[in-house]
Each structure stands twice: as structure tokens, then as C-alpha cells.
Amino acid sequence: MKETSKNQPSEDLKSVKRLHRHDKSIMQSILKFLYQPIDPSSLGITRVLFGFLMIFDITQERGMVYINLRWGDPKACEFPLLSNLPILSADWMHILYLSMIAAAIGICIGFYYRIASIWLALGHWYLILIDKTAWNNHTYLFGLFTIFFSVTNANRWWSVDGVLNQKINNVHIPRWNLALFQFQIFLVYFLAGVKKLNSDWITGSSVTTVGSHWVFAPLRLLLTTQQISQYVLHYGGLIFDLIEGYLLFFNITRPLGIALGIYFHICNSQIFTIGIFPYAMLATLHIFCNPDWPKKVIMRLSPRWRKYFLLDTPPKYSASNCYYNDYNPDDTGSRIQQFNSQNRLTMAILAGYVTLQLFLPFSHFITQGYNTWNERGLYGYSWDMMVNSWSYPKIKILVVDLSNGKHFIGGADSRFLRWSTYPSMIKQYGNCLAKQMKTSYEIKQPAVYLDIWKSMNGRFRQRLINPKVDIVSAPWSPWKKTPWLMPLLANLTNWRNKMPELKKRYSIDDKSRIIRFYADFPGYTQEVPVPAALQANLTVLEGQVEVNASRYIYKLNPKMTIRLPSNVTHTVTVTSERPAAYFYRIENATLARILAEEKENIKNRVEDYSPKSYLTYFSTSVRFVTGNIIEFLKSKVLIYYHIAINTFDAIQNIIESENITDSTLDSVSPSNN
């Protein structure tokens, strides 16, 4: 017994040493994997495509085309993430965007690649930080890509840098350069699928208006529009996102993954207005293939075309930042012979990044101040792709001067309404509006009340925030739940399935009749004007309401309907103890008459269905398609002409401003006697 206890410490020490050697062996294996040499051509192709696409992204979706509209009004409200971050003037914004285009071109052709990548990353993230209204998933993803290119060696193949410096031309790159992109793309697909595992998406309520799109025309031979929306768009989109990353990862399923990815992203590019995102995802499908796949493809070209590409295999031990397993001590080539602290630091940074990306999409229990109903956090890093669709907001603004009780009523600028969905930006808008009222209208103590009505995923349109709370003095913190955010009326969600039937029953399928569904909280009142050209009926679905119109008060219970007077503003107050739901049937009599006359003209028109008419129909269709293509090209030419003129004017303004400043300084400088 004594002898056993005496030897126990040495046995424990041996166990610790074995465990240490085991951990060291695991770390060594990970480092060998990360620094394994691979061919640079796949990442080089990704660089070329990304740089090319970013040129169009900067000019259009990043907002260069409407700089003067967005940044040219000094009174416009801004929504930066960091309030102390300076915002450039419109003229200097043109210079920033122009430099970002130059950086994107530099990335595309691989010229001063590192500097171009870093500058594009700085410019892209600056635009993100100064304008939360522009945040979305692909903006965030492109920002991550700019960082990736800043730290990887994507200019080692088919780049101007490689032509100018043969030492980096067609040399190996460490595997982590490509694995970083592979991890992020896999995560985008998979987490987009995970976020779709909610009741709204599974019941087909998130995206309901695109089932009739022309891309689904072949499917309409077998399925109805509703079935396409439910089974193809929602179920198909969910399954695709969950499995696409796995399909691309394994060699045996990769062809299927690429085929599905091409079809999916091409459809998205036609259905949704989401900029270059579908094309960027198309451009990254290949990164899961073998790293030297571009060279294998090019080898199949004729010799006259091959000469424009560098097809040689990278020489043995060609990169000093790669680890070669077949190391020969007698060889003097440049390579990693033993991992150092810098290599281990890179591994730690990559591990930290992976952990962060896995945590951020589910971190909204920390940043509760950015949450809105079931949309969690600042839209972008959550990968909630198409999960929530919002109706066009109805906004009423009331400003009260607390010093004298004067009221000012107005509406919001309809150009930029993204702020109306998120409490953090609503708070910023209220503060901005209060500041404007102080300076422009000399209001001493402004209080701002916002009545914002929105519908999410086909539910009733309801209040987003409490209209009785002064936004200026209301508390808001990124770490706490927003107290003045009204709850989602989830108990009324079951009515969503009955809304299509109600629309079909009460509304003829034309543009002259519409139905608007509303839900409100007990004790709250809504003011609704009915223009003279419209006829409106109100029907209660659930709860009790009191309607005050033309000095008459009507108390309505479920299934009761009232005809509302035109050219009068009425109020609807919820008098029941639980929330009430009701809808308006609105008809434009003038538009209805015009549409009826047009239908009658079509009915009386005699069509000739001879073979000549079919040829005429075909030629008309060809002219229509050709005309649309020409109009599209014209619009793009006009956009870039507009950008060029505005940028030239901005440069002139800056030069003139500098000249005026210099002349002013010269005029006030003391003369030398």
C-alpha cells in the first residue's frame, strides 16, 4: 500500500505528459492542415469574379447612384451604428465611392491587390457603420469577403502583381486561405436553413407574392400558385439551404449541389431585387471543388487560348508560408520547417473567428434593444434570409411643444423608411426630428410621438410601438428589451389563413377594390381619413370597437359592418378587453368605371386567329423582348452617365472649395513689409 502511494505522483505526472503530447499532436495536425500547400488558381478565380461584381455593387446597391439624394440634404436624418463616427459630405462621398471602384478593379485584376483589398474593406465597412438602413445579409457577407481578401493570398495566380513579381506568380497558398471562404459559404447556407425552421416559413406565410412569377411558369402546368409558394418556394427553399453546404462539400454530391445552386440563384436573381447577391453566390460555388480545377478546365481549350493563362504546376516548396510533408533537410527551398508563434496565432485567430460566426446569429439575447417582434438583432449577421416580409408602413408623426402645448402633425419621408422597423433607428429618428423642430420651427421643448403600423408575414397590420410614448425621452439600450415596443398580436395569427377567403369573397380581382386588415390593442384609437373618391366599409372580425364618424358613434361587435362617409376622417377605438381585429373594404368608384369600360372594349374587339396572326403575335413577342433588353441597356447607360456627371461635379466642387479656402487664407495673412 505504501509503495503504491509512493509511486502515485510519478504515474500522474506521466499521465499529464501523455495528455500534453496528445494535445500537442492535435494542434500539430491542425496546423499541418491549415498550412497544407494548395494550388492558387481557384482562389484566383474567386478574386477576379468578386472584384468584377463589386464594381456594380458599389455603383448601384451601395448607393453611388443616389449619393446626392441620400447624403446631399444636411437636414436628413442619419442612422449610424456609432453616433460619433463622422459622416462625409456628398461631394467627398463621391470620392470615397470612386476610390472603392478603383479598389474593386485592383482586386479584379490583382494590381496592388493587398492595398486594394484593405481599402475596399475600410470603405465598405465605413458605409455599413454610418447607415444601418442599408444593412442586409449580403452587405454583411460582402464585408466579410473584403476582410478575407485582405488577409489571404488571392493574387498568386492570374494577377498583374504576379506578372510584375515572378516570386509570387503561381506559387502555393496555405489551405486556410480557401477554407476560410468555404466555411463562410457553408455557414450562410446552413444557418439560412436553420433560421427558416419557424412557423411562419413552414406554413408558407413568409413570401406569398412570388408564386405567380414567370420563373415558375413550367410548374404551373402541374401546381397552383399557392402550391408553388408552399411546396417549391418555402419547403424547397428550406431543404435547399439545409443541405446545399453538405452537397457542395462532398465530392460525390458536388455536381448535384452545383446544379441546384445555379438554378436556385438564377431564380433568386429574377424574383427578388437583391442586387448582385445571387451572382456572388454563383461565383463562389466552385470554391468547394479541387483547388486546381481552373487549370484542368483551361487545359481543354485550344493552344491559342491557353497561352493567356499560367498553367504550370507550382514548383516544389514554392511558398514560404506553406508546410510540406515531404520536407528534405538537404533542400534549401523556402517553406515552413517548424511552426512558430505566428502560425499558432493565425490558428487562434481563425478559431476565434469560427466561434464568433457560430455565436453571432444566436446572440440576440444579449443585444435585446435591436430586436423587433420575432426578427432578432440588427438585420445582417443573423442570416434571416427572406424569413420576414413587411408591409409598407403607415406612419403618423405628432410633435408637441411641451412649453406651450402646440401640436404639429405630419408624415415621414417615403424615400427611406427602413428605420421604421427597428427600435434603435426609431429612437434615432425621434431625436433627429426633435433637433430639426428646434432649429427650423423654434420649438423649445419638442416631444415626438410616432404611430407606426406594420404587418409582418401576412398578419394584421398593427402598431409597432406605443404611440403614447415620447420617443425623445423614451429609454433605449442595446442591452435591454425596448419597453415601448408593442407586442406582436400572435393570438390573432389564426386569422391569416382566413384572409385569402375574405379577399376572394369581398374583393373582385381588379385594381379598383382593396382590403386592409387591422388589429389594435384595448383602449387605443386609430384615425383613418376616407378621401372623397373612395367608398369604404368597415367589418369587425374579433373584439368590439367604437367608430366615431361625422359626429355619430357606432358600437360594433364581430360580424357587424358599417358604411363610412367619404371625405371624412373617422376614428376607431377598441372597447373590448382583448385586442380587436377588423378590416376595410375600399373601392375607387372612378377607377372601377374606367376598368369596366376597358373590359367592355376588349370584349367587343374582334380578333383574327389566322396563321398570319400567329406570325404577327410571334414577331410582336420578339419585338417586346428585344425592346425590354434595349430599355434595360439604356437604363444602365443612363445610370452610369448620371454617376459620372455627379462625380465630376463633386470633384469640381471640392477643387473650388479648396481654392476658395486658399484665397481666403491669402487675403487674411499679414503682408511682409
Predicted features along the sequence, with ranges:
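Alpha-helical membrane-anchoring segments
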Residues: 1-673
